[in-house]
Amino acid sequence: CCCCCYVLSCFCYLGDSINKQDYPKNLITIFVVADNCTDNTASIARKHGAICYERFDDLHKTKGFALQYLLERIGEDYGRMSFEGYFIFDADNLLNGNYISKMNDAFDSGEKIITSYRNTKNFDENWIASTYAIHWIRSIRCNHRARSVLRLATNIQGTGFLFASEIVRDGWKYTSL
């Protein structure tokens, strides 16, 4: 699953990095919600092999509402439980070539919600990008990694995570992302 909003120049890179995974292609389905987009985001996503739903809602603009909409459409068209799990990405994300395989290894070990290492590709672009980079480094090194070593639960944030379909059996109820 991917949320997009005016990011047509970014999604093509994410779509390409998903399509280049070392994981079997027939086990990957890319869903995108083009959220309140008036540009070519939806057509770009479709050209990169995504099943794209378009959502227009000026009252409910958060990523959580976009994911809720997307999972409702998946439920209607495919059945949410017809997929073992769902990855959540933002359109400007890039994946290492073995990302899905490594996340699947953790999933196959019985984990139901898995977060991943996130890094910043534009650290020196501006102070906002640098601040986010420091936040991600701190979060991963001091929170997620330590909790993983101790086999404790952690939290998920924003992007780069996987959850079992049973988590959304009754829909996505988390709109404050």
Predicted segment positions?
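Short, acidic, metal-binding catalytic loop of nucleotide-sugar glycosyltransferases
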Residues: 16-27
